[in-house]
A protein has these predicted regions:
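N-terminal leader/targeting and accessory segments in enzymes
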Residues: 1-94, 98
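Phosphate-binding loop of NTP-binding sites
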Residues: 91-199
Length: 199
């Protein structure tokens, strides 16, 4: 990742730093929400899901070599550095928005009721003939997947093709706040997701 320090992260997500201040200028190597994919000096983001609260994995993650972790609660017995935040999900979105701004590369945003993925693949295929292009992988197109896609960007990437999907009111506003696309592609607007969006 490009020059993201623990100090940057603490400030961007309005967090509270718990740890040795000498570490604040250390740069992280990556950001992950997956406790099984820990690389040395990464930042771990524990997400509270419907069935699993990833805070339980923090001790193991830190033992595997993570530089620090976020936490939605105070960890009084922690022997490792962490940033306490109100919401891990909101923090990861704030960090993604900040990181993308630092890279200053063009963004193509793609959305629509159907056809997003195939359109993304076609656009990325054309762009990669001339530019180093990063595209959304799989279904990483929601409020967690989009930030994780952004974190895959490197300094030598020249353009990002980001798929954005919604299932609730206000979600597109939150996604575009992160991506701030320079070019937008809307494949179509149909009757998908009406179970959450209504008529």
């Amino acid at each position: 990742m490009k020059n993201l320090t623990l100090r940057n992260l603490t400030e961007v997500c309005s967090g509270t730093w718990h740890g040795d201040d000498a570490l604040l200028d250390r740069e992280i190597s990556a950001i992950t929400t997956d406790s099984r994919k820990i690389e040395k000096d990464c930042l771990f983001v524990p997400i509270v899901g419907e069935r699993v609260d990833a805070h339980r994995f923090i001790p193991d993650v830190m033992a595997k070599g993570a530089l620090a972790t976020l936490s939605e609660r105070e960890l009084p017995d922690a022997a490792y550095p962490y940033i306490q935040v109100a919401s891990s999900l909101q923090a990861v979105k704030d960090i993604a928005e900040f990181y993308l701004q630092q890279l200053q590369i063009p963004v193509v945003g793609i959305t629509g009721s159907v056809g997003k993925t195939s359109t993304k693949e076609v656009i990325a295929s054309v762009l990669k003939e001339k530019y180093r292009t990063l595209k959304t992988q799989g279904n990483f197109n929601n409020e967690l997947g989009l930030p994780l896609t952004v974190f895959r960007l490197r300094e030598d990437d020249q353009i990002a093709v980001l798929e954005m999907g919604i299932s609730d009111f206000g979600e597109m506003t939150r996604l575009t706040r992160i991506a701030k696309p320079d070019t937008c592609v809307i494949t179509n607007i149909g009757t998908c997701h009406l179970e959450n969006l209504g008529d």
